Amino acid sequence: MRAMTEGLEMHDLLAVRRDKLNQLYDEGINPFGGKFERTHTSNEVIEQFAAFTKEELEEKDDHVVLAGRLMTKRGKGKAGFAHIQDIGGQIQIYVRQDAVGEEAYGLFKSLDIGDMVGVGGRPFKTKVGEMSVKVTELVILGKSLRPLPDKYHGLKDVEQRYRQRYLDLITSPESRTAFITRSKIIQVMRRYLDEKGFLEVETPMMHSIPGGASARPFVTHHNTLDMELYMRIAIELHLKRLIVGGLEKVYEIGRVFRNEGISTRHNPEFTMIELYEAYADYHDIMELTEGVIAHIAKEVLGTTTVQYGEHTVELAPSWKRVHMVDAIKEKTGVDFWQQMSDGEARALAKEHGVPVKETMTFGHVVNEFFEHFIEETLIQPTFVYGHPLAISPLAKKNEEDPRFTDRFELFIVGREHANAFSELNDPIDQRKRFEAQLIEREQGDDEAHRMDEDFIEALEYGMPPTGGLGIGIDRLVMLLTNSPSIRDVILFPQMRNREQGE
């Protein structure tokens, strides 16, 4: 019954707004106006005139022109106040019939919350000191035919915030700020890398063989070529081909697609930056990683100290570095530096309550120990390096202990934020790694790598020693905006169809 009542109320509200729309047409007013030239945004008016006293503003003769969405309206008789909202925030406007004329004031009185308006007038301060604009011209620029969510309660339904992001952006200053911050983060990242001599490139999003990561791909079909294609699960292998071709420092910021679960940390479509630098190794990439992230925080937030949930995180270099085996040994006492068989490693896992499959090798067990005991404890920025060979098919072997690789992952607030390594540039070894991955696929791991003959052929022409890095942009934005869910920092996250329910 309540839903039916709300439905009827909404129907009535929509009908009233349609009637107002028709009335505007009847009066010869275009409810969906054309180009409108502004002189200021709301924050620019406040910044330019806030330092003046009420009396000083009364003596000035400045004229400003603004446009935005009507968010509040009050008053009666021949004068009223309202707030309009634009990209800079909100500002109060004061509309008097004797200042704008009877026709324009009649338009003002008929306006609904949500309507787009343009105003011109003189900046002034009210008795309580609020920066405002005394309007002398007013036009409607876009009629809102649907009421906005209640201004005091906003969008309580989290799913509605994600489905109708435009409403979230209208009603939530915090959400607007988060997405503006996201844009600035990417701008600063680009500028940082450009200044270090990196070349931004674009590589295919549809691959004939999915590769560069352990993940399930989305599959599509090319009608003209009559072939199956895969949405990319990583950017890596094409960028390495460019290193082979002599482009020594390259990066790409782009979308990546993984046919996996949805959670507060995962969205099937997400944004990464991957970069590769010839003649560098993973130690160089560590320095680059902490440098770029600290620089972004300082430039965008003004500080390298950020708050994430209950944690205060310091991003100023240098960050902690720990070998994966040493971290496990310190926490559990288990020493994976010791030589042991796959079976002995699995036995240790069972002894310590770490779930493992009978097909898991030594390297997989080491990684399971790390994820089980260590990962979520790494709050401050920490480079964990020395990943097992079995889980790092594209990384160079460590020369001192070839069971491990010259690879690191960056963890902050218990989450992986970056993955990097000294790239494997030996085509013979790379083929063996892919063959080992094929065995894992046969054993049921559908995320294992496939054989990529074209990539191996590229390596056979010779690739210089190279350091590579991947950073998840969305998780970095989460960290720097104190956002609990990845869907809070992706404008239009993946959702179920409405008819499927939530």
Swiss-Prot record:
The gene is lysS. Its EC number is 6.1.1.6. GO terms for biological process: lysyl-tRNA aminoacylation. One of its GO terms (cellular component) is cytosol. Its main location: cytoplasm. Belongs to the class-II aminoacyl-tRNA synthetase family. InterPro entries: Aa-tRNA-synt_II, aa-tRNA-synth_II, aa-tRNA-synth_II/BPL/LPL, Lys-tRNA-ligase_II, Lys-tRNA-ligase_II_bac/euk, Lys-tRNA-ligase_II_N, Lys-tRNA-synth_II_C, NA-bd_OB-fold. It comes from Shouchella clausii (strain KSM-K16) (Alkalihalobacillus clausii). It catalyses: tRNA(Lys) + L-lysine + ATP = L-lysyl-tRNA(Lys) + AMP + diphosphate. Keywords: Aminoacyl-tRNA synthetase, ATP-binding, Cytoplasm, Ligase, Magnesium, Metal-binding, Nucleotide-binding, Protein biosynthesis. Mg(2+) 1 binds at residues 409, 416. Homodimer. HAMAP family: Lys_tRNA_synth_class2. It is an enzyme of class 6 (ligase). CDD domains: LysRS_core, LysRS_N. This is Lysine--tRNA ligase. Its cofactor is Mg(2+). It holds the Pfam family tRNA-synt_2. One of its GO terms (molecular function) is lysine-tRNA ligase activity. Binds 3 Mg(2+) ions per subunit. The keyword Transcription regulation does not apply. Mg(2+) 2 binds at residue 416. It is found in: Cytoplasm.
